[in-house]
Structure formats: structure tokens, C-alpha cells
Regions:
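A conserved acidic, glycine/proline-rich C-terminal tail/linker
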Residues: 113-114
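Exposed extracellular interaction/assembly regions and N-terminal maturation sites
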Residues: 20, 24-110, 119, 123-125, ...
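Register-specific beta-strand positions within repetitive beta-rich fiber domains
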Residues: 1-32
Length: 146
């Protein structure tokens, strides 16, 4: 997120970063640990292809149905455009929950390399997807868990 779109506020001894336009919390730096503010996107279909904005919301729940399915990540160009100011070597992450009754395979779109191709997320299992920016419009997705 571009710095001009962020407002920082000291409140009750913690530093909060908010969206400058809506004042929606983005991240809080407190005395104990970092606090993230996440948005849940729910997909009810065999195959899911959430948008870059939905991935950046932080949590994808997927009700996989009627046979093995896929979770297709957004293209590198779309992800790069959605995360303004992300430098090479920086990461973004998303928590993924397969709450359906089918196994799901994480699949790549253009500009994305899945580090552990073929890794699946079994029924009622979860994974953390970490996207490492390696060049403009180019990411490696690390699939941790499940």
C-alpha cells in the first residue's frame, strides 16, 4: 500500500496504521506483538480463483465441492498492481482454509511459480500461502501446511 494512503495514529500506547480514506485498521504495533486486520473471502465452488484484492484481504475459505478442485492464485501482474510499493524480496501472505469435502490443489497463474507444485490441501485442512516478490510482476508462492 502506498504510504500516501496510510495514516498513523498513536492510541493507548500502540501505533496503529489505518487506511487514510476510510480509517479502516491495517496493522497495529503494540507492546506484545504485531496485530493484523484481515478480511475473510468465502468461495463456494469446486474451483476457486479469488482476486488479488481478496488474497490481500488475508483469509480465503473455500467450500470445495463435487470432486477434486483447484485454487488458482492471481497473476503476478495483478498481485503486483494490488500491492503498491512492494519491493523485490518482500512478501505478502494469505491464510487458506479448505472447508469443503474435496482435496484442493494450489495452481499458478502467469508470473507466479508455485514452489512446491503438486502440494494439495486436504478436506478441512488449511495452509499459509506466502508470495515472495522476485521481480516486477513475478512472485514465488510458498505453500506451508496441509
Amino acid at each position: 500500500m502506498a504510504m500516501s494512503l496510510v495514516k498513523s495514529i498513536w492510541e493507548s500506547g500502540v501505533l496503529r496504521f489505518r487506511n487514510k480514506g476510510t480509517l479502516t485498521p491495517i496493522i497495529t504495533l503494540g507492546t506484545l506483538r504485531l496485530h493484523e486486520y484481515l478480511v475473510v473471502t468465502d468461495v463456494d465452488s469446486r474451483n476457486a480463483a479469488p482476486t488479488a484484492a481478496q488474497f490481500l484481504g488475508g483469509i480465503i475459505t473455500h467450500n470445495s465441492q463435487t470432486g477434486a478442485g483447484t485454487l488458482t492464485v492471481p497473476t503476478g501482474a495483478l498481485l503486483d498492481a494490488a500491492v503498491q510499493g512492494l519491493a523485490i524480496g518482500e512478501t505478502v501472505k494469505c491464510y487458506y482454509l479448505n472447508r469443503g469435502d474435496q482435496t484442493v490443489t494450489v495452481t499458478a497463474a502467469a508470473g507466479i511459480t508455485i514452489a512446491d507444485t503438486g502440494q494439495t490441501v486436504a478436506t478441512t485442512e488449511a495452509a499459509i500461502l506466502i508470495f515472495l516478490k522476485t521481480a516486477a510482476d513475478t512472485f514465488v508462492c510458498y505453500h506451508i501446511g496441509a
